Amino acid sequence: MFQFYFHKDRGLNDNMVDKCKEANFDAIALTVDTITGGNRERDLKTGFTSPPRLTLSSLISFALHPMWAINYFSHEKFELSQLKDYIKQGSNLAISVGDYFSSMLDQNMDWKDAEKLRAKWGGQFCLKGIMSVSDAKKAVDIGATSIMVSNHGGRQLDGSRSPFDQLADIVDAVGDKIDVICDGGIRRGTHVLKALSVGAKACSGGRFYLYALAAAGQSGVEKAILNMKTEIERDMKL
């Protein structure tokens, strides 16, 4: 599944769909809850950008973690290959996540845009960021095949119901018409089983494998997935 962000540049959007087809992706998930960036105070405090901007603070961090510096300077220059031919901010210019969302993504995206993207893609199509019954019903109306009940990891607003809190109502309303995925807050095997017991067809998450990736690379991700699998199997037996 390819997580899709809807850009202002329609040519870029079309190109990304074409590349997904060439790469034989099974599905596209259109992200609908980040047409602008949330006020991510941690990023503001740390000065986080992608790629990293070298500052006195970051240089000190690199000095204290020499392997970071070795990896950064010994590998290919960071770039977002799908964006580099369209926008300079997509290549190697340091930009914050909030600035990227606000300046690059189409804040006027609506249901018609989502429906057109689904038609162009022509395959399994998910809307990521659905948190209400009314939006879930609309997703069914435009022909989506699945929805992710998600608040983007709680990173967009300072307060929100959790996806799990919304799950039962949404499943009751549309669960017989569309696949419902619980996204966010999934840390343990019991979390997966609780979501499935309410009616979710699947669960997804980010932090549980991204932290492992940052700490130990591919082997870390493999270990995190194995831990989750082991917990689910153990919890089902218990």
Describe the role of every protein-language-model region.
Residues L30, V149, G205:
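Short beta-strand and adjacent tight-turn residues that come in two discontinuous sequence segments
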Residues N15-V17, D43-T46, V140-G143, S162-F164, ...:
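Short, glycine/charged-enriched secondary-structure capping and boundary segments
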Residues M1-D141, G153-Q156:
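Active-site entrance/lid segments in N-terminal catalytic domains of soluble metabolic enzymes
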Residues N108-E115, A119, R161-G175:
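Short loop-to-alpha-helix "cap/lid" segments that border enzyme active sites
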Residues Q82, D165-C182, I186-L238:
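Alpha/beta catalytic cores of nucleotide-metabolism and tRNA/nucleoside-modifying enzymes
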Residues A144-S146, N151:
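Glycine- and Gly-Pro-enriched alpha-helical subdomains that act as flexible
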Residues D26, T145, K201:
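Receiver (REC) domain switch/active-site residues of two-component response regulators
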Residues G37, N151-R161, L210-A214:
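Glycine-rich, proline-tolerant flexible connector loops at the mouths of alpha/beta enzymes
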